[in-house]
């Protein structure tokens, strides 16, 4: 289901809207002119909108593609916010330039501009 979500989202993270990669971090780092450690933050993961621990099913309607950074940050909290609330939080922080390091925010300024227009 992850790959289907990745395709339907045009390879962009459900939360931050940054481009992701599925299998080749090296190519991603070269294309986007970021370091390999930075590229690894954008590995595509399957994100369950309703967590399995909360009864969420492993089916396409419950899975979106999210970069590993956003996925880990969401689930690293004591209580994971709803996908809608978390997406709003991520977009708000992007608009303020506070989600990724300044270098990544500069590299992907087009994504930030899209977030500001929403």
Role assignments for model-derived ranges:
Residues 1-33:
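Short, charged surface segments at domain edges that flank catalytic/cofactor-binding sites
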Residues 12, 45, 66:
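The −1 position to Zn-ligating cysteines in a subset of zinc-ribbon hairpins
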Residues 13, 85-88:
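Charge-dense, low-complexity polyampholytic segments
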Residues 16-19, 52, 69-73:
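Cys/His-rich metal-chelating microdomains
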Residues 20-63, 78-80:
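Histidine-centered nuclease catalytic patch
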Residues 63-86:
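Short Cys/His-centered divalent metal-binding micro-motifs
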Residues 72-76, 105-118:
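Short flanking/linker segments adjacent to small metal-binding domains or redox-active Cys/His motifs
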Residues 78, 89-105:
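Acidic, metal/cofactor-coordinating or nucleic-acid-engaging core segments within structured domains
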């Amino acid at each position: 289901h992850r790959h289907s979500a990745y395709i339907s989202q045009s390879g962009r993270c459900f939360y931050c809207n940054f481009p992701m990669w599925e299998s080749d971090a090296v190519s991603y780092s070269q294309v986007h002119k970021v370091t390999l450690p930075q590229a690894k933050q954008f590995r595509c993961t399957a994100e369950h909108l309703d967590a399995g621990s909360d009864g969420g099913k492993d089916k396409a309607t419950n899975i979106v593609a999210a970069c590993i950074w956003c996925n880990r940050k969401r689930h690293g909290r004591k209580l994971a916010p709803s996908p809608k609330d978390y997406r709003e939080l991520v977009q708000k922080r992007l608009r303020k330039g506070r989600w990724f390091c300044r270098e990544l925010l500069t590299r992907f300024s087009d994504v930030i501009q899209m977030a500001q227009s929403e």
